[in-house]
């Protein structure tokens, strides 16, 4: 069977660089999905993306849809004919819709009755008749948050469209997409190569653009070219390039023909904290900083031009000229900020609102000071240093440097605190209070930093929940989900002995009368436990494992973590399924019973050998398990409990729990309650599927 190559390229004005890759990947996914939905076989689907184009190429495309069998059920036989034996209007209407007469319809008999049915073999359409619609539907599904119109065109897209290329092998697919008639023309680089190229065959793409248009349409090839050339350039400078993935992706999306160049700046600027210089280079200019082997910033940077110049030195000089004033500003702000201590900036925090109902940043700083000290006393950190770090934690927001370079908050606080002669732990906490900033980010390194980081986040959680502004849907303006995960990660990964109950109560207490939500403590804890669920699911723990632990509502994160890992391990044991089923059975029996259970098991009432055996096992296990529970050794405890499988199975095989004798019945219910209580000291195993 003949196989074809299909190409679609949408030529646009410059696309948003941070969205380019996602758009191209989604375009390929939806083209593939639409072909599958249309029952058209195809091979590999490749995507291409450059600043002014999105393209997809499909290999081994079938020439037509596969033929399909159609079956349309009509009215029930009882409704097909009237009293005179003539077809009813409903039957005739259905038949007409199928293109047949009632007499031509077949009959379908089932156990529920007999119906008319139309069956036919439908020949698939030629693929060239489908592709224009396939492309239009795929474009309509792209993740575009905001559309725009251009000219007098009613069509909308993320950016104005200038060309639409639709080729099936060497032929143009006739049609109109996004208000543009399809053609075989693709556009080359604005300033190099051929401005317009007429493709002779879909297989020429993207090589013809590379050769004649000076456009590297293959996104991944372009990215790898930039990475390779930047690494080589850094080596020539005697350093290593900071090729952060996000910036590398953004730069790749900004250029069609990457040319990697190096430039330098005056060494005097190295007296400014590297973070401020890097913020300017990466954030404002999209430059790659260069570091030496020891991690010190070098007075060089790497940038990517979108053109091959006869005089690259002119481009280099231009970029050096652009960045110099920004670095000079950073130097000026840094030197000016040194004239005032961090502590002296505290009064200015009174002029900035944290939140209208929750007070100013000075109010927040005072609360963080108190809560940091409270936490420090419980985790073994230096209490005075934690309090001091908490008090100063927002002072750098009042500096010129942070006002101009907002992403340096915390980092500049650390540098200024060191300049002021604050203890190193206090200085470091200024930076680390914001950690972790994102999933996978590093945690604070000292206990003082941990105390301040937790205090800052818990103060925000308590305050925002306390005025009823918790996250709803996708809206989370105070980043409470991120703050919660940060608190949980710090406590769990640092194994800190903190309880969410008392921690939240203390954070709420420090607000005084400002909060209006009486249920704030429970609301915060419920929210945090919900984030626990999401976090452990991402780690690969099953939903029912997490639910089994959540049923016990443990509020000490380190303890919660130990329980989840214990239950996950328990699931791997041979005895797990049987004991989970037994726990579910026990739970149901106890829930349905109206009988009260005894405080203690009545040994004299035990008659059946299996219940005597189970009771004996429970007595022995209780003695053995208590120290394990107290030490939080839940995995060891569940391994011991796994030994109950045989006596539990034997009990249910030979004993009628709901005996007629009330004394025997209540005693057996007591035995089951004691069994369940042992498991519940870890988790509700009955919830395991």
From Swiss-Prot:
It catalyses: tRNA(Gly) + glycine + ATP = glycyl-tRNA(Gly) + AMP + diphosphate. SUPFAM superfamilies: HD-domain/PDEase-like (SSF109604). One of its GO terms (cellular component) is cytosol. It comes from the Bacteria. One of its GO terms (molecular function) is glycine-tRNA ligase activity. Its EC number is 6.1.1.14. Tetramer of two alpha and two beta subunits. This is Glycine--tRNA ligase beta subunit. The lineage of its organism: Bacteria, Pseudomonadati, Pseudomonadota, Gammaproteobacteria, Enterobacterales. The gene is glyS.
């Amino acid at each position: 069977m003949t196989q074809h190559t299909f190409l679609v390229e949408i030529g646009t004005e410059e696309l948003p660089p941070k969205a380019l890759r996602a758009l191209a990947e989604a375009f390929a996914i939806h083209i593939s999905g639409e072909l599958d939905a249309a029952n058209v076989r195809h091979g590999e689907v490749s995507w291409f993306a450059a600043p002014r184009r999105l393209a997809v190429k499909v290999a081994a495309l079938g020439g037509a849809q596969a033929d399909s069998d159609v079956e349309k059920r009509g009215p029930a036989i009882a409704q097909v004919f009237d009293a005179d034996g003539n077809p009813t209007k409903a039957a005739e209407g259905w038949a007409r819709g199928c293109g047949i007469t009632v007499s031509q319809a077949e009959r379908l008999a089932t156990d529920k009755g007999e119906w008319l049915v139309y069956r036919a073999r439908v020949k698939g359409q030629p693929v060239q008749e489908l592709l224009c619609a396939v492309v239009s539907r795929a474009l309509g599904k792209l993740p575009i948050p905001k559309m725009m119109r251009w000219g007098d065109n009613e069509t909308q897209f993320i950016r104005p469209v200038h060309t639409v290329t639709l080729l099936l092998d060497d032929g143009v697919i006739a049609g109109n997409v996004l208000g543009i008639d399809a053609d075989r023309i693709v556009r080359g680089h604005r300033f190099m190569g051929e401005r317009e190229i007429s493709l002779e065959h879909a297989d020429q793409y993207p090589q013809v653009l590379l050769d004649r248009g000076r456009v590297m349409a293959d996104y991944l090839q372009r990215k790898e070219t930039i990475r390779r050339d930047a690494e080589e350039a850094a080596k020539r400078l005697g350093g290593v390039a900071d090729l952060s993935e996000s910036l590398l992706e953004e730069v790749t999306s900004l250029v069609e023909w990457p040319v990697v160049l190096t430039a330098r700046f005056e060494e005097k600027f190295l007296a400014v904290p590297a973070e401020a210089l890097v913020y300017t280079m990466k954030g404002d200019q999209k430059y790659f900083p260069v570091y030496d082997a020891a991690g010190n910033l070098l007075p060089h940077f790497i940038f990517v031009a979108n053109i091959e110049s006869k005089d690259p030195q002119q481009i280099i000089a231009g970029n050096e000229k652009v960045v110099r004033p920004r670095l000079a500003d950073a130097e000026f702000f840094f030197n000016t900020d040194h004239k005032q201590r961090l502590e002296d900036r505290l009064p200015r925090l009174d002029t900035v609102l944290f939140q209208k109902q929750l007070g100013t940043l000075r109010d927040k700083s005072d609360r963080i000071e108190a809560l940091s000290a409270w936490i420090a006393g419980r985790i073994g950190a230096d209490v005075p240093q934690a309090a001091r770090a908490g008090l100063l934690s927002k002072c750098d927001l009042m500096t010129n440097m942070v006002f101009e370079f907002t992403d340096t908050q915390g980092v500049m606080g650390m540098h200024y605190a060191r300049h002021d002669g604050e203890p190193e732990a206090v200085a470091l906490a200024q930076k680390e209070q914001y950690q972790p900033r994102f999933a996978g980010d590093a945690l604070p390194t000292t206990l003082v930093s941990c105390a301040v980081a937790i205090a800052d986040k818990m103060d925000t959680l308590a305050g925002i929940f306390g005025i009823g502004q918790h996250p709803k849907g996708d809206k989370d303006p105070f980043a409470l989900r991120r703050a919660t995960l940060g608190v949980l990660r710090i406590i769990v990964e640092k194994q800190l002995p903190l309880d969410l109950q008392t921690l939240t109560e203390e954070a709420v207490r420090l607000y005084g009368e400002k909060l209006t939500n009486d249920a704030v403590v429970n609301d915060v804890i419920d929210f945090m436990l919900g984030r626990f669920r999401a976090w452990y699911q991402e780690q690969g723990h099953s939903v029912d494992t997490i639910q089994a632990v959540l049923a016990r509502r443990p509020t000490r994160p380190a303890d919660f973590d130990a329980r989840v890992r214990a239950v996950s391990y328990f699931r791997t044991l041979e005895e797990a399924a049987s004991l989970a089923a037994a726990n579910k059975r026990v739970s149901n029996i106890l829930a349905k019973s109206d009988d009260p259970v005894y405080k203690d098991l009545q040994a004299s009432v035990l008659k059946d050998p299996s219940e005597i055996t189970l009771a004996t096992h429970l007595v022995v296990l209780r003695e053995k398990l208590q120290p394990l529970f107290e030490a939080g050794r839940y995995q060891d405890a569940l391994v011991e409990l796994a030994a109950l499988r045989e006596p539990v199975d034997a009990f249910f095989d030979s004993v009628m729990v709901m005996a007629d004798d009330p004394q025997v019945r209540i005693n057996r219910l007591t035995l089951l309650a004691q069994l369940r209580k042992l498991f519940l000291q870890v988790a509700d195993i009955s919830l395991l599927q």
